[in-house]
Design a protein with these regions (language model features):
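Short, well-ordered alpha-helix to beta-strand connector turns
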Residues: 7, 132-133
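A short alpha->loop->secondary-structure connector
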Residues: 120-132
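Conserved non-catalytic scaffold segment of RNase H-like nuclease domains
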Residues: 2-114, 118-120
Length: 133
């Protein structure tokens, strides 16, 4: 028997962003926005959200970035911009009923939220996602 869960869903996020080898890139931009919706009762993946994101400030991916992330230039060249993808993610969350239940974002460390998302929202001049119930 499993213990009752505090959250109905876990939303697993793992952003990928522009990068250079041995140097910083400013601003670093999110180029992949994936999310898994995991039911905490069954631990099954109920749905996924996945979009590539077109970088605006550094539209050409470095060879290092392509090698490190596996994302090709053609994946991002005609992709939507971050504000457009963020809006689609908010719609997806609403469509999935997430705004009417409890959920928690899950990432590997704090880099995705505290660095990638925060900086991308600042660069794109958009607000960060709504908080969980």
């Amino acid at each position: 028997m499993t213990a009752p869960q505090r959250y109905k869903y876990l939303l697993a996020l793992d952003f990928e962003a522009t990068c250079l080898k041995h140097q910083d890139i400013k601003p670093q931009e999110i180029i992949e926005f994936p999310c898994l919706k995991i039911n905490t009762d069954t631990f099954e993946i109920e749905n996924t959200f996945h979009y590539y994101v077109r970088p605006v400030h550094h539209p050409q991916l470095s060879d290092h970035c392509i090698d490190k992330t596996g994302i090709k230039q053609e994946n991002v060249e005609h992709a939507l911009t971050f504000p457009e993808v963020l809006q689609l993610f908010e719609i997806w969350m609403e469509t999935e009923g997430l705004l009417k239940t409890t959920y928690a974002f899950v990432t590997c460390g704090n880099w995705d939220f505290n660095v990638f998302l925060r900086n991308q929202c600042r660069t794109s001049q958009v607000c960060i996602l709504p908080s969980s119930n």
